[in-house]
């Protein structure tokens, strides 16, 4: 049997996020990164869960669609939507928007929907899950919020706080089944999906 038949499918992360890339490196598997070109605008009437799942699948399918015919690949798509009081919270983009987000969330519980999709190009099958993390924010004064934003500039993350960095100081508690979900890529769920399709994550199974 040839090496090509024994070789596992390519693993591709469909994301431009350096945080997701760093998380995937923890699994110690070779992977490529491809940036999906999709419209990430939420649709009218969508729940946060539906938005996150739709975008995670769209990212994976967009990258898979650009692969050559016959390429065996497992494409990982992920998306995160934060919400409180029924309002969706996106990436702030600017300092002013980030400050407004943190002011609105202080003293509140915020839910982060971290959706994950694994698209198998060999069969066209999709595994998808939404991992919910409940985060209680501390009730901090504006001066503390400003100091945090100037220190970490978290303008590219939903909710304006990097829990893997200084942003942890803004939080009172985190409740989740997957400690990596809040950063943006639920590794417990991803490991389960990879093992389910026979990927040799822990060696030959």
From Swiss-Prot:
Principal place of residence: cytoplasm
Catalytically driven reaction(s): N(7)-methyl-GTP + H2O = N(7)-methyl-GMP + diphosphate + H(+)
Domain of life from the UniProt record: Bacteria
HAMAP family: Maf (MF_00528)
Protein's recorded name: 7-methyl-GTP pyrophosphatase
Keyword terms, alphabetized: Cytoplasm, Hydrolase, Nucleotide metabolism
The protein's Enzyme Commission number: 3.6.1.-
Record-marked site positions (Important for substrate specificity): 19, 80, 164
Any one GO CC term of the record: cytoplasm
Family: Belongs to the Maf family. YceF subfamily.
Required cofactor(s): a divalent metal cation
InterPro entries given in the database record: ITPase-like_fam, Maf-like
GO molecular function: nucleoside triphosphate diphosphatase activity
Catalytic residues in the record: 79
Reported function: Nucleoside triphosphate pyrophosphatase that hydrolyzes 7-methyl-GTP (m(7)GTP). May have a dual role in cell division arrest and in preventing the incorporation of modified nucleotides into cellular nucleic acids.
Subcellular location: Cytoplasm
SUPFAM superfamilies per record: ITPase-like (SSF52972)
Keyword Transmembrane assigned: no
Enzyme class: hydrolase
Pfam annotation, one family: Maf
NCBIfam families xref list: maf
Keyword Ribonucleoprotein applies: no
GO terms under biological process: nucleotide metabolic process
């Amino acid at each position: 049997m040839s090496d090509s038949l024994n070789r596992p499918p390519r693993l591709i992360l469909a994301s431009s996020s350096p945080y997701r890339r760093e998380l995937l490196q923890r699994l110690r598997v070779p992977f490529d990164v491809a940036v999906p070109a999709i419209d990430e605008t939420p649709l009218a009437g969508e729940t946060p869960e539906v938005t996150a799942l739709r975008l995670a699948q769209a990212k994976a399918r967009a990258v898979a669609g650009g692969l050559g015919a016959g390429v065996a690949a497992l494409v990982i798509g992920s998306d995160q939507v934060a919400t409180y009081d029924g309002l969706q919270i996106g990436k702030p983009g600017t300092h002013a928007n980030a400050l407004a987000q943190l002011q609105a969330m202080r003293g509140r519980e915020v839910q982060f929907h971290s959706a994950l999709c694994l698209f198998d190009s060999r069969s066209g099958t999709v595994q998808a899950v939404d991992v919910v993390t409940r985060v209680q924010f501390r009730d901090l004064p504006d001066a503390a919020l400003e100091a945090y934003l100037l220190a970490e500039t978290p303008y590219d993350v939903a909710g304006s706080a990097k829990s893997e960095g200084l942003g942890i100081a803004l939080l009172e508690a985190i409740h989740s089944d997957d400690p990596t979900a809040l950063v943006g890529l639920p590794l417990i769920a991803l490991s389960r999906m990879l093992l389910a399709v026979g990927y040799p994550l822990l060696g030959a199974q």
